[in-house]
Amino acid sequence: MAMKKKREGKNTSKIFDDHDHGMCFDDAIEQIENYFLKKNLQFTPLRRKVFEILIRDHKPLGAYEILEALGRDGFSSSPPIAYRVLDFLMKHGFVHKIQGLNAFIACSNPNHSHSPAFVICRKCEKVAEIDEKKSGISFASPNIENFEIEKTTVEMTGVCTTAQERQQCNAY
């Protein structure tokens, strides 16, 4: 599957155009296969399918949307099974949970250990994982006495320029 073509134009939401996981579908699958092989983990058909659903859609999906897609593809649509797969993929850095949307998204940078940061359009619900170095924003964990931070996730909510333009012409 090829990457989506970038939109041209002065007022498009560039951060979402640049996102699309920075790799094509096949590259993402190859990365996860290599990781599982290197770590001696099983890339079961169910784990593969859940990851394919998330990487294919390039958007956050709720657990029940993932369950529906699994059911359509002939897999078990049992919530406990799906949540175990999602937890496993999150543990290994291939999926992130977007708390503000109660949804899951494939990681755009799975080969690097990082604390993810996301921008979320509250109008169109597009989500982009942003890179700390490229954005110029520092996500450094604060040094808090008597507390060890295990994970930091930053979610910034606003309205993208595309949604702003649609709002001006009452498309929402």
How should these model regions be labeled?
Residues 1-40:
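N-terminal leader segment of winged-helix/HTH proteins
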Residues 43, 57-62:
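Short capping segments at the starts of secondary-structure elements
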Residues 48-53:
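Pre-recognition alpha-helix immediately N-terminal to the DNA-recognition helix
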Residues 54, 82-92:
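Basic amphipathic alpha-helical segments that dock to polyanions
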Residues 65-71, 82:
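A short acidic, leucine-rich amphipathic alpha-helix
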Residues 91-172:
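Non-DNA-binding regulatory cores of transcription-related proteins
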